[in-house]
Design a protein with these regions (language model features):
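A short, Lys/Arg-rich alpha-helix, primarily the initiator
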Residues: 2-63, 145-156
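Short amphipathic recognition helices of helix-turn-helix/homeodomain-type DNA-binding modules
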Residues: 28, 94, 104-159, 300-350, ...
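Short, leucine-enriched amphipathic alpha-helices that occur as contiguous helical runs
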Residues: 37-41, 74, 125
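Recognition helix of helix-turn-helix/homeodomain-like DNA-binding domains
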Residues: 62-88, 113-116
């Protein structure tokens, strides 16, 4: 499969590749079966299995914010370790990484679990923190050093464009830095190259979205009006997903699948570069368009493929996109990822229809 999976993840992949589950069975399995969600606590303990994890985290958080309430900090750390919550701010993830002496790669993974993206090497703070992680520095050193740097120029999100190769060029430039003096020089020299939004993810988003806005290719000569964001939302993203904001009585799986589900406002903001592209949206666009944006032949369209072959092909394709965007790869023990992997094995219906059938069963009665 190209990516090493744990035994539990491998079991899920085998289950998905069997082709034996109807949408009703898939929904029931996610809701009531033996599906084992991978939580933040499991990932955290896999990166730092020692018994002093709670003490180290609490001490590090208090050192970073001496005015914090020790009881509140202790409660936050316990909730992380016991799987009741996870950090949602990348700043907190970096604090954890420094506290546990995690490597840059381990920090990248932890960020992906919490924020959709790994270290963003076009983000000024991220590259500084990554450098201090690589060189064995402390969180307070990294934070104070970053605070001493010149402010980044304000960039209008709608105009934040340019070569998508800049991120890798920046990463390579900072890998050549060997002292805080060089770090400051490199940072100042690249002030105009920094930005908050991810360009590669936006590139995929626009290609997929353009396919939905202009469903009839120009070369056909057929006339069809462009779809509005409202129409796209209704036609493609509704998928029988409950619109109510109330989640009272919902299961964990229901909450996870509903979380960050796109709406019209979100699509408009992302299109206008006012917000980043969420990982879930990118996966949904892959399913909705079936990754067909250029009309080229793809073997995944052929009926002779077995469910396993079809799943393998989409597994490689999706993971290549996610990796290119700086997002974590597919995890068969993630509820949304599992649903996406189930959808891409569709043969007699479209991927989005297959996904919608599962969602209908999962949210029946809501």
């Amino acid at each position: 499969m190209g990516l090493e999976l744990t035994l539990l993840s491998e079991n899920e992949y085998e289950r998905l590749s069997s082709g034996d589950m109807t949408p009703a069975m898939a929904a029931r399995y996610l809701q009531e079966g033996e599906f084992r969600l991978r939580g933040f606590d499991e990932v955290l303990r896999s990166l730092y299995p020692k018994s002093d994890i709670q003490q180290r985290l609490a001490a590090a958080l208090l050192e970073a914010e001496p005015a914090s309430n020790p009881e509140s900090v202790g409660r936050t750390v316990r909730n992380w370790i016991n799987g009741h919550s996870k950090p949602t701010r990348s700043e907190d993830v970096f604090r954890i990484a420094f506290a546990l002496d995690l490597s840059e790669a381990q920090t990248n993974r932890l960020l992906g679990v919490c924020t959709d993206y790994g270290i963003h090497y076009r983000n000024g703070r991220d590259v500084v923190y990554a450098w201090f992680l690589r060189t064995g520095g402390a969180y307070t050193e990294a934070r104070d050093f970053f605070a001493s740097l010149p402010e980044l120029p304000q960039v209008d999100g709608a105009t934040e464009c340019g070569s998508s190769h800049i991120t890798r060029e920046l990463q390579n430039a900072f890998l050549q830095v060997h002292s805080t003096g060089e770090l400051r020089e490199c940072y100042i020299a690249n002030l105009d190259n920094f930005g908050a939004l991810h360009r590669r993810a936006y590139g995929y988003f626009r290609r997929y979205l353009d396919r939905l806005i202009h469903p009839v290719p120009a070369w056909t000569g057929l006339e069809e009006p462009d779809y509005s964001m409202e129409a796209i939302m209704e036609l493609y993203f509704s998928m029988s997903m409950p619109s109510s904001r109330s989640k009272c009585g919902w299961s964990v799986v229901q909450r996870l699948i509903k979380y960050n589900w796109p709406n019209t406002t979100a699509l408009k903001n992302i299109r206008n570069r006012k917000a980043d592209v969420p990982r879930k949206l990118l996966l949904l666009l892959y399913v909705i368009t079936e990754n067909v944006v250029d009309g080229e032949y793809r073997e995944t369209d052929e009926d002779y493929l077995s469910p396993r072959e079809r799943l393998d092909d989409h597994w490689f394709a999706i993971n290549a996109i996610l990796t290119d965007c700086g997002m974590p790869p597919l995890d068969p023990r993630n509820a949304t990822d599992w649903l996406v992997l189930y959808a891409v094995t569709a043969t007699e219906e479209s991927m989005s229809e297959r996904m919608e059938k599962v969602i209908e069963h999962i949210f029946a009665g809501q």
